[in-house]
UniProtKB/Swiss-Prot annotation:
Residues 1-64 are annotated as: Domain I. Residues 144-154 are annotated as: Flexible linker. Residues 65-143 are annotated as: Domain II. Belongs to the RuvA family. It comes from Rhodospirillum centenum (strain ATCC 51521 / SW). Homotetramer. Forms an RuvA(8)-RuvB(12)-Holliday junction (HJ) complex. HJ DNA is sandwiched between 2 RuvA tetramers; dsDNA enters through RuvA and exits via RuvB. An RuvB hexamer assembles on each DNA strand where it exits the tetramer. Each RuvB hexamer is contacted by two RuvA subunits (via domain III) on 2 adjacent RuvB subunits; this complex drives branch migration. In the full resolvosome a probable DNA-RuvA(4)-RuvB(12)-RuvC(2) complex forms which resolves the HJ. It comes from the Bacteria. The gene is ruvA. This is Holliday junction branch migration complex subunit RuvA. It is found in: Cytoplasm. Keywords: Cytoplasm, DNA damage, DNA recombination, DNA repair, DNA-binding. NCBIfam families: ruvA. The keyword DNA-binding applies.
Amino acid sequence: MIAKLTGLLDSTGLDWAIVDVGGVGYLVSASARTLRRLAAPGEAVSLLTEMWVSEDNIQLFGFADTEERDWFRLLTTVQGVGARVALNLLSALSPAELTNSIAAQDRTALCQADGVGPKLAARILNELKEKVASFGAPAPAAATAGKGGAAPAGPAGAVADAVSALVNLGYRRVEAFTAVNAVAQRLGPEAGVSDLIRAGLKELSP
């Protein structure tokens, strides 16, 4: 198992890089985010890697950091998400944006990635919504309505209502969710919906 490559960058393409390690060139598939962070050809690079072995192929996938690698592993546990789609998601959204998008159940954000349609996005949201807490996301209950479409009672309900209000004002769900959860942590459980909306708007102001 190859877990890390350290060598000289030979060349790059739209979704790959070749790393020269002791005179051997390793072809590594990578996200656009990782490729942007690489040094110039001829300079030293270091990539964390995942190696997939099949009957007729060996593939290496490279990552700039452990967070992106861990997201790749998690995404590929979802049915219908192969390595290519996982890298497309990591190209379209940073790990932090992925975390917040899934916690906020923001299907539109996931559909920015090539190869991700509404049905696959919904499956990703459903299968990973309980797992994003390990990546530092707020509890999913804060972003979703209760049974029958009503927001849950208590602080989570106030957060959900405030997020919905900001979305109705034209903000993207993921940015509304991120802003409201940030101010909810500062204001505490006594904050009402109107308090969260006002503070959320200030958080979103440039």
